[in-house]
Amino acid sequence: MDESALLDLLECPVCLERLDASAKVLPCQHTFCKRCLLGIVGSRNELRCPECRTLVGSGVEELPSNILLVRLLDGIKQRPWKPGPGGGSGTNCTNALRSQSSTVANCSSKDLQSSQGGQQPRVQSWSPPVRGIPQLPCAKALYNYEGKEPGDLKFSKGDIIILRRQVDENWYHGEVNGIHGFFPTNFVQIIKPLPQPPPQCKALYDFEVKDKEADKDCLPFAKDDVLTVIRRVDENWAEGMLADKIGIFPISYVEFNSAAKQLIEWDKPPVPGVDAGECSSAAAQSSTAPKHSDTKKNTKKRHSFTSLTMANKSSQASQNRHSMEISPPVLISSSNPTAAARISELSGLSCSAPSQVHISTTGLIVTPPPSSPVTTGPSFTFPSDVPYQAALGTLNPPLPPPPLLAATVLASTPPGATAAAAAAGMGPRPMAGSTDQIAHLRPQTRPSVYVAIYPYTPRKEDELELRKGEMFLVFERCQDGWFKGTSMHTSKIGVFPGNYVAPVTRAVTNASQAKVPMSTAGQTSRGVTMVSPSTAGGPAQKLQGNGVAGSPSVVPAAVVSAAHIQTSPQAKVLLHMTGQMTVNQARNAVRTVAAHNQERPTAAVTPIQVQNAAGLSPASVGLSHHSLASPQPAPLMPGSATHTAAISISRASAPLACAAAAPLTSPSITSASLEAEPSGRIVTVLPGLPTSPDSASSACGNSSATKPDKDSKKEKKGLLKLLSGASTKRKPRVSPPASPTLEVELGSAELPLQGAVGPELPPGGGHGRAGSCPVDGDGPVTTAVAGAALAQDAFHRKASSLDSAVPIAPPPRQACSSLGPVLNESRPVVCERHRVVVSYPPQSEAELELKEGDIVFVHKKREDGWFKGTLQRNGKTGLFPGSFVENI
């Protein structure tokens, strides 16, 4: 096929003129000359394909050129089919061939005919001589070459060698006198180079697609397949053709020849130090060195990438490889979440430098690669100045607490220091910076702590078992929705589904917040360990009315809720949920973090009181310079049960206000956050409040130290029964008052405070979670402490707690004589009475079961149409749809 016959095929279907480089290709892949397209737009004011009538939305100038057409035209110009006048390179080649009569006489007619037909000549050991030679790629021998092993081509100086193909940059395969063989490049002078090869690439790995419907645009191939490159799609993908299929494929899976390399670099901006003709790969590196030994040369000739012609295959430095760096891939069809995590964009880890995780007797150590930040969340980049080991802090080793641990809270520890020492004698870790710097550098804590909200049974060896309420430290989130982390109870590392857990950590909202490290440990059985800072500090408070001056005191330990959990490398609290609680209590306490709105602070006082018991072991809380005083110190009593209570800590550096006259209350873990409003409102525990044995709790959650030992022992037995879950006896209900308001009145000294909860106060916002709903009100109840009224946050309780029999709202309107000296004013919290008109079955633990005719005291009406209130029938507080009730 000559040039004219080929060009006749490259004509515009509209005007039948020959196409040139200005031709445009439409989205339907039909190509027309630019002049015809402009004429169509000018006459019809729109552009439709003349062949398929497809409407084109873009202008003619915006349409792309046909790259294959451009390359074909360039190839025709660079390689004329007929000898050009004036003695070009082809003419010189022909004259040189004619001057060598012996060489001309020995050329192969079969090779010449196949070359004239545009076909690749067949390699054979011997060809009969012919008379004429067209313009074939050829070279002139500069030196004699005898060949050193079978397969080498022998020639003499001055011989004209017909070039068949280029093995690599140092070797050619050619023909002299009808004999084919290999010869070195530096022994010849190229007279006419080989034609430019088509843009092709060789597959280095298998590329498979799992979902053929979703990935129908992908072009699957096997290793060593040769693909024709069409164009570059984006930074990491190219379009190509294999057999009769066209699709896209990842650039890093293939090795390009020089023509394909130029095509790939067509739209990419030039980078200094990178040659567009270079192609770097592991396969090419084996054939770039000069021939130094027979073994090396033979290996190069037999195993080179012979199907492609490489113009320049010198190895590039790794920094110049950009996105086309070839690395061992992970198959897209892989279902292993750990394998999929390698190509995850969320992981932030390079395949060549994954994080190393070691488990030893010293605990969990995660070492990030030096050049890649470890990421575990939406912004999941660890600061460079803090190592990953520091982020794990006191989790070395993350084992269950040993028996007989003394849990202390040292409020006098400098803010920002990490003092969550384990019972094995681990001392406080030194602080790496001030609290302000920590809050500034780490707006979100690392690593992420998650709590299991559903149980999960592992199906593979690398999966972790999830138990409801168990805590996990997540240090990698895979793209397929799986998490990689470690159980904070068993210390095992593995993967688990991300939708089975809920995050615990939250962003630090107060940069100047002072953190007081606290460690509260259990004694026996299995504990759930989590890392959290507590907030305390500020001026010491004094009690007004009983003349008690502020001084350090010792109060029983408190099991704090999991609703306020943070993991900061500089300020942590190692908190253990002890085995003295029932399993449901511990899980409910941890489960609160799943749905707890952590930006809405609340406070809590548990509703069950216990008397001074000789069998309760103390977990001391030292509040140096920050605690409230008490008229007498709390006795330290040995025993096997850890007495726990819920305490509230002010976010704005308010002190822990707990009386030390007697142990505090309740084995039940409330769902309150460990923070109050930023204005410094706290829940103050007042000493010296006498209570009756039937009393469920006092307004401030402390117990009297003046009861006889008989009552104390009786109360102790009841507490142990509650802790073990053996007690199912319900306390008598208190009938609701005539008035729906929640108000604490001052009365005679003989009447104790009754009811499950003291004054109801509005928290910072709506708050809903499984198993507990706080009671909101419209007006605050203030308590005068140290001459100033401290506004309290709302008390709330879990509907599933052991004290659920005691109604919490509305409490009976009876006087509390013990509050007389300290309460200067009390304001009612307004509630609205509603009647249930349609029964409503609850859909979750946070919702109330409504029966037709029930009376509900509504505390808050939300914007979404849901109400929060207390059911008069059983005293439970929760959410329910407002359309099921009517106001009375």
Swiss-Prot record:
Region (Interaction with RAC1) residue ranges read 292-362
At what positions is Phosphoserine found?
S304, S532, S735
Pfam families xref list: SH3_1, SH3_9, zf-C3HC4_2
Polar residues bias: where? 108-127, 305-321, 520-535, 692-704
Q: Keyword annotations for this protein?
A: Cell projection, Cytoplasm, Golgi apparatus, Host-virus interaction, Metal-binding, Phosphoprotein, Repeat, SH3 domain, Transferase, Ubl conjugation, Ubl conjugation pathway, Zinc, Zinc-finger
According to UniProt, the reaction catalysed is: S-ubiquitinyl-[E2 ubiquitin-conjugating enzyme]-L-cysteine + [acceptor protein]-L-lysine = [E2 ubiquitin-conjugating enzyme]-L-cysteine + N(6)-ubiquitinyl-[acceptor protein]-L-lysine
Compartment(s) where it occurs, according to its Swiss-Prot or TrEMBL record: Cytoplasm, Perinuclear region; Cell projection, Lamellipodium; Golgi apparatus, trans-Golgi network
Quaternary structure note: Interacts with RAC1; in a GTP-dependent manner. Interacts with MAP3K10/MLK2 and MAP3K11/MLK3. Interacts with MAPK8IP; this interaction leads to the PJAC complex (POSH-JIP or SH3RF1/MAPK8IP apoptotic complex) with a 1:1 ratio. Interacts with SIAH1. Interacts with HERP1. Probably part of a signaling complex that may contain SH3RF1, MAPK8IP, DLK1, MAP2K4/MKK4, MAP2K7/MKK7, MAPK8/JNK1, MAPK9/JNK2, AKT1 and AKT2. Found in a complex with RAC2, MAP3K7/TAK1, MAP2K7/MKK7, MAPK8IP1/JIP1, MAPK8/JNK1 and MAPK9/JNK2. Found in a complex with RAC1, MAP3K11/MLK3, MAP2K7/MKK7, MAPK8IP1/JIP1 and MAPK8/JNK1.
Q: Know the name of this protein? A: E3 ubiquitin-protein ligase SH3RF1
